[in-house]
Curated annotation (Swiss-Prot):
Disruption phenotype annotation: Up-regulates expression of liaI which in turn induces the liaRS two-component regulatory system.
Name used for this protein in its record: Protein LiaF
Pfam family, one: LiaF-TM
NCBIfam families to which the protein is assigned, alphabetical: LiaF_C_term (NF040535)
Keywords for this protein: Cell membrane, Membrane, Transmembrane, Transmembrane helix
Topology class, membrane: Multi-pass membrane protein
Stored InterPro entries: Cell_wall_LiaF, LiaF-like_C, LiaF_C, LiaF_TM
Induction line: Induced, via the two-component regulatory system LiaS/LiaR, by antibiotics (vancomycin, bacitracin, nisin and ramoplanin), cationic antimicrobial peptides (human LL-37 and porcine PG-1), Triton X-100 and severe secretion stress.
Domain of life: Bacteria
Keyword Signal: no
Subcellular location: Cell membrane
GO cellular component terms given for this protein: plasma membrane
Protein's organism: Bacillus subtilis (strain 168)
Transmembrane portions of the chain: 6-26, 49-63, 66-86
Length: 241
């Protein structure tokens, strides 16, 4: 979806909302539509589980407005999360792991798994923060997802192996700050629905913003890090130290 299409969609939604307000049923649809759109962008740019929770939350809000159910924001959000978590567990999948394409195991049952397969460090939180700033840490592929909260990572503290390491961060509301040592080659891509992005000097702000930036010798470097950040509301700041 282009920015012009997105802007047109938002204007149309506000127009529909005003019309529904005039005829007396505006509150029935505005917030459900808002969270429905939020779910769409989260599933497009981020993890499926966050988008799915938003879809369920939008359905709860619609039913609440339709049947005048007592509103409890935390209760609805937590119930939406539990429904999705239960669905994932019933399907035999981890709660926070993104859906992956199924592999035909029959064709590979006689083959041993590759010995050089990386096992990413998976971290997630509902409300809180993640800081990797003070203590040294080994950087295998890192995958972080959160609902509400800030994330701060200092790569000068990281023990980075040769080759390409990846960091994938996704969230709904919060800020992401990543500090990069001057001798490390990085490539960073970020998508934010509402907020500011500053990627090693490339800045952009506004609505449905995307930025990509890479250091000059990234592709030739023996030790490099690729970073991907997706947020619904928040700021992303990746800078050299």
């Amino acid at each position: 979806m282009t920015k012009k299409q997105l802007l047109g969609l938002i204007i149309a939604l506000f127009g529909i909302s005003m019309f529904l307000q005039i005829i007396g049923i505006g509150d029935l649809l505005f917030w459900p539509l808002f969270f429905l759109i939020a779910g769409y962008f989260l599933k497009k740019y981020s993890r499926d589980w966050l988008g799915s929770v938003m879809y369920i939350f939008a359905a709860f809000l619609f039913l609440k407005n339709l049947f005048s159910i007592t509103f409890n924001l935390f209760g609805y959000a937590f119930a939406a999360f539990l429904i999705y978590a239960g669905y994932r567990l019933i399907k035999g999948k981890p709660i926070f792991e993104p859906n992956e394409k199924q592999v035909n195991l029959n064709k590979k049952e006689h083959h041993e798994p590759p010995k050089d397969v990386k096992h990413p460090d998976m971290r997630s939180f509902f409300i809180g923060e993640l800081q990797m700033m003070k203590q040294p840490f080994d950087l295998n592929d890192l995958n972080v997802s959160g609902f509400i909260g800030d994330i701060k990572i200092d790569l000068s503290k990281a023990m980075i192996p040769e080759g390409e390491s990846t960091i994938v961060i996704s969230g709904v509301i919060g800020n992401v700050d990543i500090y990069v040592p001057s001798d490390l080659e990085v490539a960073v891509s970020s998508a934010v629905f509402i907020g500011d992005i500053n990627l090693i000097g490339s800045k952009k702000s506004g609505l449905s913003t995307k930025v990509y930036a890479a250091s000059t010798d990234f592709s030739e470097s023996k030790r490099r890090v690729k970073v991907s950040v997706s947020l619904f509301i928040g700021d992303v700041d990746v800078k050299y130290v």
